[in-house]
A protein has these predicted regions:
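A short, flexible loop at the N-terminus of ABC-type nucleotide-binding domains that lies
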Residues: 1-6, 12-23, 72-73
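ABC ATPase nucleotide-binding domain
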Residues: 5, 27, 63, 350-352
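The feature captures the beta-strand-to-loop junction immediately N-terminal to the Walker
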Residues: 37-39
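Helix-to-loop junction immediately C-terminal to a conserved catalytic motif
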Residues: 52
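Conserved coupling/switch loops of ABC nucleotide-binding domains, chiefly the family-specific signature
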Residues: 58-61, 111, 211, 245, ...
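Conserved ABC transporter NBD signature motif
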Residues: 60-68
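ABC ATPase nucleotide-binding domains
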Residues: 74-231, 235
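Glycine/charge-rich catalytic "coupling/switch" loops of P-loop NTPases
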Residues: 254-311, 341-371
Length: 371
């Protein structure tokens, strides 16, 4: 069992004005693929390094497989780590690079050979075993680094931004390779990235962090559909969610968002619990994703109550879609529309959106109101 339990974990560096990681609580199941995601400096890599034993835990307790590991040396934690830099020995062949850690542990030669060749087969680098790192592409070098971790047969894989040095095309293919590798090895993976696309496409669950604090832990779909606050809503999704200034109004049993003259009626099934009663007359932030805004005639006809007149600042053709960068009463908005859209730079365009896709956030706390 390679479950991981992080209980009230803190990392406090000497002289720091605030903890780098604050009250980190997380239960990771055996064989789960967990992603730590957030902007630079949010504490994700520091947390990973505490799991690895490369950083001391300031407060709290950490368990791997039910065993307290706070004071266990990295070599005894049954983990393997893959870094952003491949850290391959340039004078050694691929075979020797993969085998090096096992040789240091005095593993029998026949066992080393078996593990190296098994890893090479899984990673499709059998034909590269006699080459030196300088003869390899970036993707091949990353596979060698993964192979070096694999042969240890660890209970937990820790991957710290392993694809950051690769170009966009190679990152896409390597994402797929790592997902396949996780399924083949059936071990616990913890993957750190600042790239929300990697997070959304790879993880069983995602831990979103900001300023050393967990913001939300959830499945990719739930993070997208039900963000707990404005930070998560804006960080997950590309282009990011639009935020408009509004005021909650109520007429009879109908709640609406007043966007400065344009009333957006909210679906009654989303407001029936009375959560909005305390917000009537108060300002809120209304969120709507770019993909939920459209100027297509059929969509417009379906959502006649949720339409806005906007000004097109920039129309960006992306091939399969167009990004419209819009201005609405001082608010900047982005819409992802079909390539058949006729909207162009400088045009006034009327757009609609699905009210069921509307998110509302408290102006002061930035927490979600409806979810």
């Amino acid at each position: 069992m390679a479950s991981i339990s992080c209980q009230h974990i803190y990392k406090i560096y000497p002289g720091a004005t605030a903890p780098s990681v604050t009250d980190f609580n997380l239960e990771i199941q055996d064989k789960e693929f967990i992603i730590f995601v957030g902007p630079s400096g949010c504490g994700k890599s520091t947390t990973l390094r505490m799991i690895a034993g490369l950083e001391e835990i300031s407060k709290g307790e950490m368990y791997i497989g039910g065993r307290l590991i706070n004071d266990v040396p990295p070599k005894d934690r049954d983990i393997a780590m893959v870094f952003q830099s491949y850290a391959l020995y340039p004078h050694m062949t691929v075979y020797k690079n993969i085998a090096f850690g096992l040789e240091l542990r005095k593993t029998p030669k026949d066992e080393i050979d078996k593990r190296v060749r098994e890893a090479a087969k899984v990673l499709d680098i059998e034909h590269l075993l006699d080459r030196k790192p300088k003869a390899l592409s970036g993707g091949q070098r990353q596979r060698v680094a993964l192979g070096r971790a694999m042969v240890r047969n660890p209970a937990v894989f820790l991957l710290d931004e392993p694809l950051s040095n690769l170009d966009a095309k190679l990152r896409t293919s390597m994402r797929t390779e790592i997902i396949k590798l996780h399924k083949k090895l059936a071990t616990t993976f913890i993957y750190v990235t600042h790239d929300q696309t990697e997070a959304m496409t790879m993880g069983d669950r995602i831990v979103v962090m900001k300023d050393g604090i967990i913001q939300q832990v959830d499945t990719p779909q739930n993070l997208y559909d039900m963000p707990c606050n404005m930070f998560v809503a804006g960080f997950i999704g590309s282009p990011q969610m639009n935020f408009l200034d509004g005021t909650i109004v109520k007429k009879g049993d109908q709640y609406s968002v007043d966007l400065g003259g344009d009333l957006i009626p909210l679906p009654k099934e989303k407001t029936a619990d009375g959560k909005l009663d305390s917000y009537v007359g108060k300002k809120v932030k209304m969120g709507i994703r770019p993909e939920d805004i459209d100027d297509e005639p059929e969509f417009m006809a379906k959502h006649t109550d949720c339409q806005l007149d906007t000004q097109v600042d920039v129309s960006e053709m992306m091939g399969a879609e167009i990004y419209l960068y819009l201005e609405y009463k001082g608010n900047k908005m982005t819409a992802r529309v079909a390539p058949t859209s006729k909207a162009r730079n400088g045009d006034t365009v009327r757009v609609a959106f699905d009210p069921h896709k509307v998110h509302l956030f408290d102006v002061e706390t930035e927490q979600t109101i409806l979810n």
